[in-house]
């Protein structure tokens, strides 16, 4: 831990983790997204491991969901995105995949949010853009967020970048973050490492650190 001008500047994930100042972000773990991914089941299992320990230690947890608007309200951004993602040439063939209340929009049942956990819907890629997430985290005194989910190259990378710009310390759980395209996911991680804004960890390490922080905080042996 570095100290300067009254500030504590963590250099490791262990130094960054303070249960009262840390939140877990579960990004876009939705039925309609996971069923498109080759390794969807593996990512669900990894995210479930992190979520279980976060719940065990009482970590604040927020879920993010990608939301489609009805077709007549999609606007230029969502229409262009839908044409690209659905590989369609005509707007007549495009369908809003993630309408609120649809099966595709729901979080996968293995990770079903609890009443004590927030769920924020978004139409953009960054979890902070157009959602109350930043306000909610700041009001709870959160300074660090641990992020898991999908997809690295689409939404997790911009969330980490914007979070860092907002003054948070992002902690990316690499093996609990999936990608739609493996090469693109690797490039996203490499780019985040190059920037130096985020910290990186694994499911094994972060679950160990969360439990250790909980023992230290509670005074348990």
Per-segment meaning from a language model:
Residues 29, 66-68, 175:
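Active-site loop/turn elements of alpha/beta-hydrolase fold enzymes
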């Amino acid at each position: 831990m570095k100290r300067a001008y009254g500030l504590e500047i963590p250099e490791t994930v262990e130094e960054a983790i303070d249960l009262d100042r840390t939140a877990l972000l579960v990004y876009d773990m939705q039925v309609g997204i996971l069923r498109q991914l080759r390794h969807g089941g593996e990512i669900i299992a990894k995210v479930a491991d992190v979520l279980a320990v976060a719940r065990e230690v009482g970590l604040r947890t927020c879920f993010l969901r990608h939301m489609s608007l009805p077709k007549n309200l999609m606007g230029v951004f969502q229409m262009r995105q839908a044409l690209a993602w659905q590989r369609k040439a005509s707007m007549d063939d495009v369908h809003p995949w993630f309408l609120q209340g649809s099966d595709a929009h729901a979080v996968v049942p293995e990770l079903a949010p609890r009443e004590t956990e927030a769920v924020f819907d978004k139409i953009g890629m960054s979890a902070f853009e157009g959602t109350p997430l930043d306000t909610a985290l700041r009001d709870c005194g959160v300074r660090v967020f641990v992020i898991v989910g999908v997809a690295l190259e689409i939404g997790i990378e911009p969330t980490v970048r914007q979070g860092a710009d907002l003054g948070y310390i992002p902690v990316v759980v690499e093996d609990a973050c999936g990608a739609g395209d493996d090469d693109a996911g690797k490039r996203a991680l490499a780019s985040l490492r190059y920037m130096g804004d985020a910290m990186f960890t694994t499911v094994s390490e972060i679950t160990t650190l969360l439990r250790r922080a909980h023992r230290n905080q509670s005074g348990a042996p």
